[in-house]
Curated annotation (Swiss-Prot):
It comes from the Viruses. Gene3D superfamilies: 6.10.140.720. Its EC number is 2.7.7.48. GO terms for cellular component: host cell cytoplasm; host cell nucleus. It catalyses: RNA(n) + a ribonucleoside 5'-triphosphate = RNA(n+1) + diphosphate. This is RNA-directed RNA polymerase catalytic subunit. Coiled coil: none annotated. One of its GO terms (molecular function) is RNA binding. Residues 249-256 are annotated as: Promoter-binding site. It is found in: Host nucleus; Host cytoplasm. It comes from Influenza A virus (strain A/USSR/90/1977 H1N1). Residues 286-483 form the RdRp catalytic domain. RNA-dependent RNA polymerase which is responsible for replication and transcription of virus RNA segments. The transcription of viral mRNAs occurs by a unique mechanism called cap-snatching. 5' methylated caps of cellular mRNAs are cleaved after 10-13 nucleotides by PA. In turn, these short capped RNAs are used as primers by PB1 for transcription of viral mRNAs. During virus replication, PB1 initiates RNA synthesis and copy vRNA into complementary RNA (cRNA) which in turn serves as a template for the production of more vRNAs.
């Protein structure tokens, strides 16, 4: 029977059909090869947007720098970075006037945070540029390396464990005439293999000391490493993102803390909240504009798009904003917040791995590292690359490009939102002093502008005024990509508004299915995704039930764990059938052991082990959750785990799911091939780091975990904790006198060894 597809929509309001317009199901595109070209594009574009600014030279590093601030205003639509300082300061003053005390209060909140934050805050985050090894590392390792180098250079303030003291070391390190670092290197030797008698290359990893003079150190401290942004949908071209080093990160964190505190108090800000809270905030602004426009006014909304937001922002402007926001605050606080924008005005972009060349005729491949781009003959490159390199050459120093203007992606999201909101704030009638007025929403570079006026000419005038005000602050609204509609229909940060926010269920499609972490986590994540979509995305009961059945089917095919009484033959069916036959209570078997599915839409919030616990055979319970069973991994599992979900659009979301440690929550082993590479030394460092942390956890289990008060090293904290615990256990009779004496002796020995060291 043929079905006319339009019939499907007869009963559906038009706005609900949005889910059918999303093509984002399969895997998103990933980048391959080097990001060098994309980074050069970013650097060149950024300079082009500010080209009529003033050139200066950095006295310390000799890097040429372009300063577009207070530069000539653009005559036409071209995007440009010529923000005017006095306009930015005035916008800040008006923002404060409409929100009395907002800056003052946020500063007080931030000051508390600054004094309490521990340096381990910097271990959060994924890849970080490690300046000691000149490449990316996990954040914790990069921090450990930085602190190790600081201490070997006599910078000891960081020992207190407070972030602000670590930052004092960073500042002092920049005044040093030279800094000594430890780097890893590889030795290759040709040796004869005893067994096969062939020559083989043997690699050994060494660590060596290296001295950096002030200039080289500053260049590294100010370097942002670049990578290609992965998994971006709907774009043909990839683009570069930056990872800053440990020197910059701490300062940025404090600036963003201040800006976040301000954003929380601004009704037009789409950050830092998310999800339903964000929708409620936005709906309020829309409601306000529509209520006031009922009789005499008309109301229009622009779904806005800014051209190259990051590349036209300027750290010098952020410095002006911070100087204004903190103007009545103590000197130390103002200094610490002004360092991030100053470092960003002097930043260097690392060009990445360089270019790969291959000669088809000679079957040769060779890599041209970024350091060589400054003086290599350009005849080897194609036209577009040649143009890029010619343009960037005057900016190059040691394989990094001087990039004073522009911000790089994702660095000051909160602070740039404050700048955007300050323009929306100027739309009140008391500032426009005319018949039109505006309000709107801002979330980093995304905005929606609602304009009210008595007639169309007024709307046009309002939009023009908004557009020109943005230009004064270095924000470029794109006339090509923004569009205007009657208020009631617009899109903002991938939320579609049509008389209320429309649930766009298809955005979540990529996160349905089996994640491939392990049997335990996958089951838990799968049902949590369905539960969350019932709560947030209008996933109805019938569809949810169907999604659940499809998920279970998918799960069984992935892990080859079809029910014990099925006819399907897989590699595991022999074991599963055997287990099925010898189990009395078959309903108690987990799905991953060939058991039946007991989930329905009412019990999705319960972990499967808990759901079936009462139904399990006793010996099955014993095997499944026995802490002495070597296959039960307790090491990774806390009561709540986090999975990273990738929706079709927008940032990866952190999703919490419950997990129970069982024989199914295994953690895969590391790939062996890393052990033969230069990474090996780092891996060993990382494992040592891990062991120390695990040991510390044993002494301070999370249930009783209060941060050790006062300034003590990890060892001192553990020794004093061991003494206290031993005394309590001895006095309550839990341990014998001999054991107590032995513990005390061990503690003294450890202290003695530390003194000798």
């Amino acid at each position: 029977m043929d079905v006319n597809p339009t019939l499907l929509f007869l009963k559906v309001p038009a706005q609900n059909a949005i889910s059918t317009t999303f093509p984002y199901t399969g895997d998103p595109p990933y980048s391959h090869g080097t990001g060098t070209g994309y980074t050069m594009d970013t650097v060149n574009r950024t300079h082009q947007y500010s080209e009529r600014g003033r050139w200066t030279k950095n006295t310390e590093t000799g890097a040429p720098q372009l300063n577009p601030i207070d530069g000539p205003l653009p005559k036409d639509n071209e995007p440009s970075g010529y923000a005017q300082t006095d306009c930015v300061l005035e916008a800040m003053a008006f923002l404060e006037e409409s929100h009395p005390g907002i800056f003052e209060n946020s500063c007080i909140e931030t000051m508390e945070v600054v004094q309490q934050t521990r340096v381990d805050k910097l271990t959060q985050g994924r890849q970080t540029y490690d300046w000691t090894l000149n490449r990316n590392q996990p954040a914790a390792t990069a921090l450990a390396n930085t602190i190790e180098v600081f201490r070997s250079n006599g910078l000891m303030a960081n020992e207190s464990g407070r972030l602000i003291d670590f930052l004092k070391d960073v500042m002092e390190s920049m005044d040093r005439e030279e800094v000594e670092i430890t780097t890893h290197f590889q030795r290759k030797r040709r040796v004869r293999d005893n067994v096969t008698k062939k020559m083989v290359t043997q690699r050994t990893i060494g660590k060596k000391k290296q001295r950096l003079n002030k200039r080289s150190y500053l260049i590294r401290a100010l370097t942002l490493n670049t990578m290609t942004k992965d998994a971006e949908r709907g774009k043909l071209k990839r683009r570069a993102i930056a990872t800053p080093g440990m020197q910059i990160r701490g300062f940025v964190y404090f600036v963003e803390t201040l800006a976040r505190s301000i954003c929380e108090k601004l009704e037009q800000s789409g950050l830092p909240v998310g999800g339903n809270e964000k929708k409620a905030k936005l709906a309020n602004v829309v409601r306000k504009m529509m209520t006031n426009s009922q009789d005499t006014e008309i109301s229009f909304t622009i779904t806005g798009d800014n051209t190259k937001w990051n590349e036209n922002q300027n750290p010098r402007m952020f410095l002006a904003m911070i100087t204004y926001i903190t103007r009545n605050q103590p000197e130390w606080f103002r200094n610490i917040l002004s360092i991030a924008p100053i470092m960003f005005s002097n930043k260097m972009a690392r060009l990445g791995k360089g270019y790969m060349f291959e000669s088809k005729s000679m079957k040769l491949r060779t890599q041209i590292p970024a350091e060589m781009l400054a003086n290599i003959d350009l005849k080897y490159f194609n036209d577009s690359t040649r143009k890029k390199i010619e343009k960037i050459r005057p900016l190059l120093i040691d394989g990094t490009a001087s990039l004073s203007p522009g911000m790089m992606m994702g660095m000051f999201n909160m602070l740039s939102t404050v700048l955007g909101v300050s323009i929306l704030n100027l739309g009140q009638k008391r500032y426009t002093k005319t018949t039109y007025w505006w309000d709107g929403l801002q979330s980093s570079d995304d905005f929606a502008l609602i304009v009210n006026a008595p007639n169309h000419a007024g709307i046009q005038a309002g939009v023009d005024r908004f557009y020109r005000t943005c230009k004064l602050l270095g924000i470029n609204m794109s006339k090509k990509k923004s569009y205007i509609n009657r208020t009631g229909t617009f899109e903002f940060t991938s939320f579609f508004y049509r008389y209320g926010f429309v649930a766009n269920f298809s955005m979540e499609l990529p996160s349905f299915g089996v994640s491939g972490i392990n049997e335990s986590a996958d089951m838990s994540i799968g049902v949590t995704v369905i539960k969350n979509n019932m709560i947030n995305n209008d996933l109805g009961p019938a569809t949810a039930q169907m999604a659940l059945q499809l998920f279970i089917k998918d799960y069984r095919y992935t892990y080859r764990c079809h029910r014990g009484d099925t006819q399907i033959q897989t590699r595991r069916s022999f074991e599963i059938k055997k287990l099925w036959e010898q189990t009395r209570s078959k309903a108690g078997l987990l799905v991953s052991d060939g058991g039946p599915n007991l989930y329905n839409i009412r019990n999705l919030h319960i972990p499967e082990v808990c759901l079936k616990w009462e139904l399990m055979d006793e010996d099955y319970q014993g095997r499944l959750c026995n802490p002495l069973n070597p296959f039960v991994s307790h090491k990774e599992i806390e009561s709540v785990n986090n999975a990273v979900m990738m929706p079709a659009h927008g940032p990866a979301k952190n999703m919490e799911y419950d997990a129970v440690a069982t024989t199914h929550s295994w953690v895969p082993k590391r790939n062996r091939s890393i052990l033969n590479t230069s990474q090996r030394g780092i891996l060993e460092d990382e494992q040592m780091y891990q062991r120390c942390c695990n040991l510390f956890e044993k002494f301070f289990p999370s249930s009783s975990y209060r941060r050790p008060v006062g300034i003590s090293s990890m060892v001192e904290a553990m020794v004093s904790r061991a003494r206290i615990d031993a005394r309590i256990d001895f006095e309550s009779g839990r341990i014998k006198k001999e054991e107590f004496t032995e513990i005390m002796k061990t503690c003294s020995t450890i202290e003695e060894l530390r003194r000798q060291k």
